[in-house]
């Protein structure tokens, strides 16, 4: 149905999806162009109920301090740290963005959404220990990673993570890195606070329980979006000069619906994740870290297990996982027909090719699906030897849609990270992919602005405002210990985080960002 012109609302910006990405973009735009009218459409009954919900996140506060898959080894055995630096720099932009929002009163009570939580890498086995030491040494070349400490001493490790050491074989060889400046972030809380603030502003409207039915282009180049209220069945329409699709797993199908040729390049493959969780306060209070392991031999790096301290719904809990799950849904609250309905004549071959080329990944997923409760509990005990089965339950987290892009040579390739897909005329943009996801929402949305509103970003007005919000904009913190220290101190104070360690100014930095190596695509698959 083409809604009658009289019923069609007109806005400058329409955002589809009420998660961390859309809300972050809306806050950016409201800062830069307060007079623009905006509408946000969300199919569920509240914002941040899909992947932005804390219980549906696979992990948070990603800043490459502990995730070993962001520092691959090259064929000569050298550890490449360029991806880790890129992700850490991006996270510092997020910290600055949130700090500004706290100062403006948009975000309230920093402890409700961000808390200091040390990040650790925790490995055993001679090869893994050797790799971790090499990784630690390589990262010391960057001021961003200077506070990291390395230890193979059981007594020291027990001081950091007593829970992981009690009941462990004293002769087991271990190696860990411990970084005190890590954080745990609740993106559901940030999203709710962002949208709550936007709702108090003139020119912003939120439509909940509203599912997009159709997206068509108007003669004047704007977008006509029709949506249905799932509660009462009423249908509405909005015309927007700019349309952003930040609908998580639902983004691919909506981009396909728009008919833009750029969307034909992509296919999506859903991967879910489940976690073991304990809410026992006695246990939770004994563990204060996000401890990342290394993928078992033969398993792809996406399977890296972690024992995570999280603050969810105001209480401290521990999550262990992820264990891969499979469903043809693209969203936790999606349809089992999602995978089939997103498959087209354009993307079926790339998907098939990736399935053939990534056979170990397929094998891994199949193996994960066959795990029993006992298998999962045994995996937990390698990290927490004294865990009691009755204190843990299995929780199904959110769905991630791994993106596959058409490739002239290979037919199709798995794509790393998140990808901004925009039309040639830059009137519509969508976000595909999953990792590192929400942790880098502020810089990813800044990238959307640079892509879509290129001319405006170049104006002195936008430049000045962006630099006010993100003081380090346009510079590389990695190049300067003084700039890194300044940014840490500023954001830690505003966000009420632990006082950052002082970087030793006598150490020379620079040249740490080795040239990126081509890492395996599954390195970045987020569960």
Swiss-Prot record:
GO biological process: tricarboxylic acid cycle
This protein's pathway: Carbohydrate metabolism; tricarboxylic acid cycle; oxaloacetate from (S)-malate (quinone route): step 1/1
Record GO terms (molecular function): 2-hydroxyglutarate dehydrogenase activity; L-malate dehydrogenase (quinone) activity
Catalysed reactions, as listed in the record: (S)-malate + a quinone = a quinol + oxaloacetate
SUPFAM superfamilies tied to this protein: FAD/NAD(P)-binding domain (SSF51905)
UniProt enzyme class: oxidoreductase
Record EC number: 1.1.5.4
Keywords (A to Z) from UniProt: FAD, Flavoprotein, Oxidoreductase, Tricarboxylic acid cycle
Cofactor(s), by name: FAD
InterPro entries: FAD/NAD-bd_sf, MQO
Family classification: Belongs to the MQO family.
PANTHER family: L-2-HYDROXYGLUTARATE DEHYDROGENASE, MITOCHONDRIAL
Name this protein carries in UniProt: Probable malate:quinone oxidoreductase 2
Gene assigned in the entry: mqo2
């Amino acid at each position: 149905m083409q809604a009658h012109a009289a019923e069609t609302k007109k806005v400058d910006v329409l955002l589809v999806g009420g998660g961390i990405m859309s809300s972050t973009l809306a806050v950016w735009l409201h800062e830069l162009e307060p007079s623009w009218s905006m509408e946000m459409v969300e199919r569920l009954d509240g914002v941040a109920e899909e992947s932005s919900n804390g219980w549906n996140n696979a992990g948070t506060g990603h800043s490459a301090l502990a995730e070993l898959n962001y520092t691959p080894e090259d064929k000569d055995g050298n550890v490449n740290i360029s991806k880790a630096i890129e992700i850490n720099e991006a996270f510092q932009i997020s910290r600055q963005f949130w700090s500004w929002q706290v100062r403006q009163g948009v975000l309230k009570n920093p402890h409700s959404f961000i808390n200091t939580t040390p990040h650790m890498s925790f490995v055993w086995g001679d090869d893994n220990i050797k790799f971790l030491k090499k990784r630690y040494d390589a990262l010391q070349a960057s001021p961003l990673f200077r506070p990291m400490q390395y230890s193979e001493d059981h007594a020291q490790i027990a001081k950091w993570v007593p829970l992981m050491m009690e009941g462990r074989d004293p002769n087991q060889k271990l190696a860990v890195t411990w970084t005190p400046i890590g954080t745990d972030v609740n993106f559901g809380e940030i999203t709710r606070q962002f949208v709550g603030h936007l709702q108090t502003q003139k020119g912003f409207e939120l439509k909940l329980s509203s599912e997009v039915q159709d997206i068509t282009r108007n003669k004047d180049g704007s977008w006509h979006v029709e949506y249905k209220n799932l509660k009462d069945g009423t249908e509405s329409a909005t015309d927007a000069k700019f349309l952003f699709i930040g609908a998580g797993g639902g983004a691919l199908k909506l981009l396909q619906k728009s008919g833009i040729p750029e969307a034909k390049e992509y296919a999506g493959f859903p991967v879910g994740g489940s976690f073991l969780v304990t809410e026992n306060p006695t246990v939770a209070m004994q563990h204060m870290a996000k401890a990342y392991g290394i993928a078992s031999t033969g398993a792809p790096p996406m399977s890296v297990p972690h024992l995570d301290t999280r603050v969810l719904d105001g209480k401290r809990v521990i999550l262990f996982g992820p264990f891969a799950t499979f469903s043809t849904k693209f969203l936790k609250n999606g349809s089992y027909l999602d995978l089939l309905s997103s498959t087209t004549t354009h993307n079926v071959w790339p998907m098939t090719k990736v399935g053939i080329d990534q056979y170990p990944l397929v094998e891994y997923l199949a193996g994960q699906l066959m795990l029993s409760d006992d298998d999962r509990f045994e995996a937990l005990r390698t990290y927490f030897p004294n865990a009691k089965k009755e204190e843990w339950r299995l929780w199904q987290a959110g769905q991630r849609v791994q993106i596959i892009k058409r490739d002239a040579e290979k037919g199709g390739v798995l794509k790393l990270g998140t990808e901004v897909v925009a039309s040639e005329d830059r009137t519509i943009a969508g976000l595909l992919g999953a990792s590192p996801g929400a942790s880098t929402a502020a810089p990813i949305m800044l990238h959307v602005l640079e892509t879509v509103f290129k001319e405006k970003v170049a104006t002195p007005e936008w430049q000045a405002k962006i630099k006010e919000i993100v003081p380090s904009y346009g510079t590389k913190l990695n190049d300067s210990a003084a700039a890194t220290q300044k940014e840490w101190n500023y954001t830690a104070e505003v966000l009420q985080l632990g006082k950052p360690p002082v970087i030793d100014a006598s150490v020379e930095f620079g040249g740490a960002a080795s040239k990126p190596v081509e890492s395996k695509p599954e390195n970045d698959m987020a569960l």
